[in-house]
Regions:
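Bacterial N-terminal signal peptides that target proteins for export
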Residues: 1-10
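Beta-strand signatures of extracellular beta-sandwich domains
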Residues: 69-73
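C-terminal motif of bacterial Sec signal peptides marking the signal peptidase cleavage site
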Residues: 17-20
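Bacterial signal peptide processing site
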Residues: 22-25
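N-terminal edge beta-strand
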Residues: 29-56
């Protein structure tokens, strides 16, 4: 085998090996889809751990029989502190919110969101409508 053919074979093999090793990189071409299903009285998400600076595309579907809202909110006063708050106070805490008018039964709403920094303490996905949060309609998430 000539040196030229041997060199070409080595380069081709190295290129294939390097290409095969490069598949674990994060997809930076677009937002990360997050599918969220709301029901009575549950929140289920395809993603529960998020990174600051990454764009997430939330696809929120109300699979329940009553209207719900979807909020990303810091946990206050051990979580149940929301029980004594007005709706205006809850809305003011929201990092992101889709209102109950937008989420009647069967509705799907899509929204993009970027966690710009890690909020202090814990955060949750929440439906803060009267009685919904108290019935267990929240789900802890992490931003790391």
């Amino acid at each position: 085998m000539s040196y030229t053919k041997l060199f070409g074979f080595v380069i081709a093999t190295a290129t294939l090996l390097l290409a095969a090793c490069g598949g674990n990189q994060a997809n930076t071409d677009g937002p990360v889809d997050v599918k969220v299903a709301l029901g009575e009285f549950t929140i289920k998400s395809s993603v529960t751990e998020f990174k600051p600076g990454v764009q997430y595309h939330f696809i929120v579907t109300n699979e329940g029989q009553v209207a719900h809202e979807f909020m990303i909110i810091p946990v206050t006063m051990g979580g149940m502190g929301m029980a004594g708050m007005s709706m205006e106070e809850k809305d003011a805490l929201a990092l992101m919110m889709i209102s109950e008018e937008e989420l009647p039964p069967g509705a799907t709403v899509e929204m993009d969101y970027i966690f710009t920094s890690v909020p202090e303490g814990s955060i949750e996905f929440v439906c803060a409508l009267p009685g919904h949060f108290e019935a267990g309609m929240y789900s802890p998430i992490a931003v790391k």
